[in-house]
């Protein structure tokens, strides 16, 4: 076992220290230049589209249509993104890599926004019908766009095991630690409650999943941001110092000489990817479920999800920690560091608040992570027996994760996440021309004053699409 752990650790070091960082930053920049930094230029359009998808009129109309709304799909991907990485992961990055790690998390979010746009637009282009819903993601665009079902199958296995099983164990482990610190609650009870609540949702289908995260995600995000804003306002005079610390430690001479710069970059990129998932190939599984009139609409909304996760939620945690006196404490790490930092700002009840917040963040991640596995189980086989076996395995891992920290399992999650990212990034490079063409089509229609509507025939060479044939609009079912 020790030998296996060493091998996995060595592979992870190579993957995360060299290959993945180079690919994430390099391809993120490539996509950014090819789309002319659309993730910045069209930020206002992203907000508008999200608002339209969340309107009461849209939500009422969506109940009678296929698929889920663009806002529900956004909440599904955000549910997976916004989890323990936002509270515990940021704390780990700061304690091990210093304040400079925050800058690299920001950077990977900004340039990763372009990668998120490309992969989510492709997921919409190649989505398939599934009864009165849609499904899709990397496995589907690998099969239909690259004609490589075998590659899609490999990706499906990786995401099902890593997100549905291992990452969900990570989430429940962090919740158990937070509740132990705040209430001294038996970890087995925490795991049982989480598994029970999750079972009610995952046996109800994609629309029940969408409704659940649509309720949880906005509430938990607003409350957490409000608390963070209170901390910032009450420490407003220290904000310039925090920014100074972040940028000095990101590029400082001390870090270069002492080797700390590498740790800051490595941890910032790694935790940034774990948190916002840009380019990893996970969020496209949620993006494909949306019923929209143009793939670019959901590409924009999923890009906004990356920014919401890292530039907003992760930054809240970073400022809570860096505005405290405990961020250099050697004996604090992970969720305990976040709890102690917030306690310094708002009093001892902060540990209770963080425990509840981490429960909501993590539970929403359990739901989102589960769905990623489900849609890929359907790609692989679609057997009800296999799907139910997967559901039971997910619930078992939630229970196991609450009571056990098995380092080799966490290392295996890092390995699978890295391989997933590499496979997905290579795939979207080869297919990106269709996302670029779809963006051109969208912008052209917007300039003509139209609400953009997409047809596959508008892009030369685009084949094997199921949901974008021109005759399909004859039924007048208007998407959101």
Describe the role of every protein-language-model region.
Residues 1-84, 95-100, 430, 434-450, ...:
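N-terminal alpha-helical transmembrane segments of multi-pass membrane transport
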Residues 2-4, 34-39, 85-90, 165-176, ...:
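Transmembrane helix-loop junctions in multi-pass membrane proteins
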Residues 9-49, 95-132, 308-314, 351, ...:
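Extracellular loop-to-transmembrane helix junctions
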Residues 23-30, 34-47, 173-179, 185-194, ...:
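Membrane-interface loop-to-helix entry segments
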Residues 27, 31-32, 108-132, 138-139, ...:
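Helix-loop-helix module between adjacent transmembrane segments
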Residues 37-68, 89-102, 114-146, 327-345, ...:
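Flexible loop linkers connecting adjacent transmembrane helices
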Residues 58-94, 122-125, 131-139, 143, ...:
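Alpha-helical membrane segments and immediately flanking helix-loop junctions
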Residues 117-126, 131, 227-245, 253, ...:
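Extracellular/periplasmic helix-exit of transmembrane alpha-helices
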């Amino acid at each position: 076992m020790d030998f296996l752990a060493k091998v996995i650790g060595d592979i992870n070091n190579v993957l995360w220290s060299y290959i993945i960082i180079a690919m994430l930053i390099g391809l993120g920049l490539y996509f950014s230049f090819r789309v002319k930094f659309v993730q910045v230029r069209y930020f206002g359009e992203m907000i508008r589209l999200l608002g339209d998808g969340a309107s009461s009129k849209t939500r009422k109309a969506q109940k009678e249509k296929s698929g889920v709304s663009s806002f529900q799909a956004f909440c599904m991907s955000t549910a997976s993104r916004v989890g323990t990485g936002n509270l515990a992961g940021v704390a780990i990055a700061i304690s091990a890599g210093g304040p400079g790690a925050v800058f690299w998390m920001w950077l990977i979010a900004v340039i990763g926004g372009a990668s998120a746009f490309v992969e989510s637009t492709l997921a919409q282009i190649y989505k398939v019908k599934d009864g009165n819903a849609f499904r899709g993601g990397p496995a589907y665009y690998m099969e239909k766009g690259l004609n490589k079902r075998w590659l899609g199958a490999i990706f499906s296995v990786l995401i099902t095991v890593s997100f549905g099983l291992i990452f969900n164990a990570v989430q429940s482990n962090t919740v158990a630690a937070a509740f132990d610190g705040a209430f001294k609650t038996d970890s087995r009870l925490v795991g049982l409650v989480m598994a029970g609540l999750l079972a009610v949702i995952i046996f109800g289908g994609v629309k029940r999943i969408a409704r659940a995260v649509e309720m949880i995600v906005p509430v938990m995000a607003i409350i957490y941001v409000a608390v963070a804003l209170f901390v910032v306002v009450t420490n407003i005079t220290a904000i310039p110092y925090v920014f100074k610390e972040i940028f000095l430690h990101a590029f400082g001479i001390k870090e270069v000489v002492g080797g700390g710069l590498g740790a800051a970059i490595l941890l910032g990129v790694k935790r940034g990817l774990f948190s916002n998932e840009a380019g990893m190939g996970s969020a496209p599984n949620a993006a494909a479920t949306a019923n929209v009139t143009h793939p670019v609409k959901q590409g924009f909304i999923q890009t906004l999800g990356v920014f919401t996760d890292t530039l907003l939620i992760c930054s809240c945690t970073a400022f809570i920690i860096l505005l405290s006196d405990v961020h250099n404490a050697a004996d604090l790490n992970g969720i305990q560091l976040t709890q102690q930092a917030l306690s310094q700002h708002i009093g001892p009840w902060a540990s209770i608040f963080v425990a509840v917040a981490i429960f909501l963040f993590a539970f929403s991640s359990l739901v989102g992570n589960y769905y990623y596995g489900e849609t890929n189980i359907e790609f692989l086989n679609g057997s009800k027996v296999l799907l139910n076996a997967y559901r039971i395995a997910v619930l078992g891992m939630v229970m196991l994760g609450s009571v056990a920290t098995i380092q080799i399992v966490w290392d295996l999650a890092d390995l699978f996440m890295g391989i997933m990212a590499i496979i997905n990034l290579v795939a979207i490079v080869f297919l990106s021309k269709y996302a670029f063409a779809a963006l051109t089509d969208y912008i052209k229609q917007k300039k003509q004053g139209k609400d953009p509507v997409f047809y596959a025939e508008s892009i030369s060479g685009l084949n094997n699409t199921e949901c974008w044939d021109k005759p399909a609009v004859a039924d007048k079912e208007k998407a959101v």
